[in-house]
From Swiss-Prot:
Signal peptide: none annotated. Keywords: Cell membrane, Membrane, Transmembrane, Transmembrane helix, Transport. It comes from Lactococcus lactis subsp. cremoris (strain MG1363). Pfam families: ECF-ribofla_trS (PF07155). InterPro entries: ECF_substrate-spec-like. The gene is hmpT. Its main location: membrane. The chain crosses the membrane at residues 14-34, 35-55, 62-82, 105-125, 126-146. This is Thiamine precursor transporter HmpT.
Amino acid sequence: MKLMDNKNIKKLTLLAIWTALTFVLGRLFTFPIPGSAGNILTLLDVGIYTAVFLFGKREAAIIGGFAAFLLDLTAGFSNYMFFSLIIHGGQGYLAGLTRYKWLNFLLSLLVMVGGYFIVGGLMYGWGSAIAGLWVNIVQVIVGFVLAKVLSPLIERTGILNGFRKA
């Protein structure tokens, strides 16, 4: 009995590579924000939004959740890692939920910014959570814009030939 065919292995491999690339992108460009008790500005969202544009919502949820989890684990924010798994996983899923890109963007922004606002408020107080709102809003907007630019360029290279968006 064949457990996995070549198509599934190729898809799993591609998702693992994209998760690693998203993690590395986020880890290399991580900037702690003073006075915001745990907020960081990172380019992780570029990988999440690029994943949703290239692969689909389920794949982006997996990539976003695991890459964010690994980022927090290795960057000294382990108190956030399980929250990040859920928040960025939800962000990736909602970014591809409907056929309306503006609605998807708004939903994904709300889950990411709102999720970290609640977690930050419970961990460090609501004043700190309010102070960190702008960081997450900027991170989402920059991630979305860069992904909109990068996704067509990546598609044109042909490296994703044979992979169908779900």
